[in-house]
Design a protein with these regions (language model features):
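Short, flexible coil/linker segments at or flanking structured domains
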Residues: 3, 87-89, 136, 147, ...
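N-terminal intrinsically disordered, low-complexity regulatory tails that precede a folded domain
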Residues: 1-99
Length: 260
């Protein structure tokens, strides 16, 4: 699961909480996805200019009361982390990710897309949208961690109950064996240890879903394929909730003065 929104949320919040400076935060984001800039700004009242670098945009938003970044990881039928209106929700669902940005007097949304130019330039373009002034309905960290564990158990049982002939099935089964030994955390400094742990676990299980999906129907009966698909769907939903909860777990109530 390669996400452009997660690094912006993690490092943006680390900057807002005073744990890193603006330059360090933007550098960390761009190490993941290449140069980041604001794409075409719709013809509405939004505090962005088309084509400006991410660093410039964030500096301007700071002067407008920027106070939080929130991660959205929606899919069709599950608008996780979104608050509307329709235009923002549709764009984020199609991208399967987005960011809510809290300003002093409003909330705006950012939806990423690949910015490819020529044969070698690859970066990220952020399209801004108006967002409804509401809090997204997302789980807390403890709730999301527990749901992830339960979904893992269900998915492991579903895998064991089918005769999978896919060549990478052993890799999937090994990763379904437990939640220990996750990869590097996608979070930045300032997040609590539990959030880092949950993000690591969710990142590894996102890989399980990616490995298992291509073989969901090969060599299986209709019932087996349905069982496997449902287990993976629930695991994917739990992974997305865990990532959203982990990225929202930083304390922004006692901010230092972020570096410029």
């Amino acid at each position: 699961m390669h996400l452009s929104s997660a690094p912006l949320v993690a490092w943006g919040n680390a900057w807002l909480s005073g744990h890193v400076g603006l330059d360090e935060a933007v550098d960390a984001v761009e190490r993941r996805g290449g140069p980041n800039l604001i794409g075409t700004v719709p013809a509405v009242d939004l505090p962005f200019d088309s084509g400006v670098p991410l660093r410039t945009a964030l500096s301007r938003l700071r002067g407008l009361g920027l106070s939080a970044f929130r991660l959205a990881l929606p899919t069709w039928g599950d608008p996780l982390g979104l608050v509307g209106p329709k235009e923002l929700n549709q764009a984020a669902v199609e991208a399967r990710e987005g960011v809510l940005v809290r300003l002093a007097d409003r909330q705006v949304g950012l939806v990423p897309s690949a910015d490819r130019r020529g044969s070698s330039y690859v970066g990220v373009s952020w399209t801004p949208y108006p967002a409804n002034d509401a809090l997204p309905q997302v789980p807390g960290l403890a709730e999301a961690e527990q749901a992830l564990k339960l979904a893992l158990i269900e998915a492991a049982r579903a895998m064991e109950g089918v005769d999978d002939v896919a060549p990478f099935a052993p890799d999937v089964h090994r990763q379904l064996g437990g939640l220990d030994g996750g990869g590097p955390s996608s979070l930045a400094r300032g997040y609590p240890p539990r959030a880092h742990r949950v993000a690591e676990q969710a990142g590894r299980l996102a890989r399980v879903v990616e490995l298992a999906e291509p073989s969901s129907g090969r060599g299986l009966t209709a019932h087996q394929a349905t069982t496997r698909s449902e287990g993976l769907r629930r695991l994917d939903a739990a992974v997305r909730r865990a990532l959203v909860a982990a990225h929202g777990a930083i304390d922004l109530s006692d901010r230092g003065v972020p570096g410029r």
